[in-house]
Amino acid sequence: MLNLGVAAMYRKTLKHVCGVKNVNNTINKPFNNLTIKFLNVLSRLIIENKENKSYPDLITFAFWIRNSKILFIKKKLDNLESKVSKGIIFHISPSNVPLNFAYSFVFGLLTGNSNILKLPNKNFPQVKIFC
């Protein structure tokens, strides 16, 4: 089971943003099917919302996490069966790039890790849409 929860750090205060509050630190296999399905559903939700069309960076992100693209990336990697996840990853993203945290989050998920994200301090609409 993919136990998703997003905790974000705002100005040194950890705040639960979405998902489950008590995330079990379960190590998943890299590029597991449940994560790939989740990303594909997220992609569709972002693309299908007409209001998101005014944010090209968000639409680009949504196309990047589509099933076909993730499977293409997976196919390019060698020996995924021998790879082991680390457990929990803490991401600190720059405050001047709205969706940098989302790309880090995806890489964390795809490598089978639980993630804690520090969201940008600036009030970007893309961050609110994503979270």
PLM regions: where:
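Conserved small-residue-rich beta-alpha loop and adjacent elements
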Residues: K75-C131
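N-terminal Rossmann-like NAD(P)+-binding subdomain of aldehyde/semialdehyde dehydrogenases
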Residues: M1-K86
